[in-house]
Amino acid sequence: MLNNFLNLELLNISLSYPFLFLITTAIVLLLCSGFWKFHRSFYIGISSLSLIVSAFLILNNANAQGLEAKAFLATLNNDIVSFYASLVILCFSFLYLLMQKEENQGEFYALFLFMIASLLLMVSSSNLALIFIGLESSSLALYTLIAMRGSDNAISSAIKYFSVAAVGAGFFVMAVAFIYLKTGTLDLSANLALKNEFQKDPMLLGAGVMIFVLCAIKLSLAPFHFWLKDVYYAAHTNLVAFISVVPKVAMLVVVIRLFDFLNNTGFEYIIIVLAIFSMLIGAFAALSQNNIKKMFAYSSVVHSSLVLVACIPLLKEQNFDGILLAIFGYWTLFAFAN
């Protein structure tokens, strides 16, 4: 194992260049803001350029190694799911920066790049430990961004979001412990070979349900959506548009990998009930709102439920490529509409 880890060819470090470059740029911006004062156009320009370079590195990796490459002992993947999700994340992050016309603090842009790098790490891995690291790193940055911009209630809404997500993170960690206890691995793709054992083991099925609790919180599915209305109302409008798309695309990748793991276990019945319940709650709650941002919050609940319904066939191994095309196609159109 140690020899494999020291083998640079097996490590395939180039797959990590896109998010390592963003992290390096974020550190540079953080240092610049600490010693000099620049206009926001400088921070926006550097941040936008770093996103473009990161997208180029992803395309270059896909061209040079294909969409089956792995890195760091197969903990990082360059599959079609991570490839498309990474480009969507970078594209709409770039559009968000173009809308940025008020923020002059370099710390804001450094945190933003840290968050995007963490999201890229999350979508590029099927290893539960790396997924959790990417998820929590991006979430901590997002909580801070929400608190930095918006109304007087932005800090309290960020704390509420943090509190709800912390509960979900606890479920996630407990589920990871159960999965490792039963399988001896943290790799969701490796666990696909254990489907027969998984179908008979209530501990592993329960672990899958606990992981999905965190996914439901991040996707703002009812009844885990209580944080969303306050965040949408208090956060800056541009940031609301960003929150409604980019973090959810990253979490959608985790759901896709999780559903592969939960294949043919009967888990789809739980998802169907949750999706229908979430649609109804979001639709009826939106009708009673007198604030447009709060109405959009419940609209986001409904959209997440629709995407969740599209993911259900993944639990039955039916036309995987067609399902992914429909899911990402819908979410991309929704993002442009936003």
Regions found by a protein language model. Give the residues of each.
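Alpha-helical transmembrane segments of multi-pass membrane proteins predominantly involved
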Residues: M1-N338
